[in-house]
């Protein structure tokens, strides 16, 4: 019984250390993701503008197609 308790204590200790290291690494990764560079902001704005223009063009082409075919 005593050796079983020692084994469980050792597993708990090693698991706690591993979990602690993972949390520290995850925290370091999250810190890097917070800062956005100016390039990323510009890229996001350009993508938004491009997608909006694309949706408008598709909508206009659908209306023109509908008028020509008589939907």
Curated annotation (Swiss-Prot):
<dbReference type="GO" id="GO:0050829">
    <property type="term" value="P:defense response to Gram-negative bacterium"/>
</dbReference>
<protein>
    <recommendedName>
        <fullName>Ranatuerin-2Va</fullName>
    </recommendedName>
</protein>
<dbReference type="InterPro" id="IPR012521">
    <property type="entry name" value="Antimicrobial_frog_2"/>
</dbReference>
<keyword id="KW-0878">Amphibian defense peptide</keyword>
<keyword id="KW-0929">Antimicrobial</keyword>
<keyword id="KW-0044">Antibiotic</keyword>
<comment type="similarity">
    <text>Belongs to the frog skin active peptide (FSAP) family. Ranatuerin subfamily.</text>
</comment>
<keyword id="KW-0964">Secreted</keyword>
<dbReference type="InterPro" id="IPR004275">
    <property type="entry name" value="Frog_antimicrobial_propeptide"/>
</dbReference>
<feature type="propeptide">
    <location>
        <begin position="23"/>
        <end position="43"/>
    </location>
</feature>
<keyword id="KW-0732">Signal</keyword>
<keyword id="KW-1015">Disulfide bond</keyword>
<dbReference type="GO" id="GO:0050830">
    <property type="term" value="P:defense response to Gram-positive bacterium"/>
</dbReference>
<feature type="disulfide bond">
    <location>
        <begin position="66"/>
        <end position="71"/>
    </location>
</feature>
<feature type="signal peptide">
    <location>
        <begin position="1"/>
        <end position="22"/>
    </location>
</feature>
<comment type="function">
    <text>Antimicrobial peptide.</text>
</comment>
<dbReference type="Pfam" id="PF03032">
    <property type="entry name" value="FSAP_sig_propep"/>
</dbReference>
<keyword id="KW-0165">Cleavage on pair of basic residues</keyword>
<dbReference type="GO" id="GO:0005576">
    <property type="term" value="C:extracellular region"/>
</dbReference>
<dbReference type="Pfam" id="PF08023">
    <property type="entry name" value="Antimicrobial_2"/>
</dbReference>
